[in-house]
């Protein structure tokens, strides 16, 4: 899980999701998981 000020989709499998006010990236590749913070 990477915590970043700006989250971006890295590959075509990355999906940007907003969960309870937090922007997250979910992906098949665990290295691409991100959270805004």
Swiss-Prot record:
Keywords: Ribonucleoprotein, Ribosomal protein. Belongs to the bacterial ribosomal protein bL36 family. HAMAP family: Ribosomal_bL36. Coiled coil: none annotated. GO terms for biological process: translation. The lineage of its organism: Bacteria, Bacillati, Mycoplasmatota, Mycoplasmoidales, Mycoplasmoidaceae. The keyword Hydrolase does not apply. It holds the Pfam family Ribosomal_L36. This is Large ribosomal subunit protein bL36. Transmembrane segments: none annotated. One of its GO terms (molecular function) is structural constituent of ribosome. It comes from the Bacteria. GO terms for cellular component: cytoplasm; ribonucleoprotein complex; ribosome.
């Amino acid at each position: 899980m990477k915590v970043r000020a700006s989250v971006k989709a890295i590959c075509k499998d990355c999906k940007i999701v907003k969960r309870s006010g937090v922007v997250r990236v979910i992906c098949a590749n665990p290295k691409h998981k991100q959270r805004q913070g």
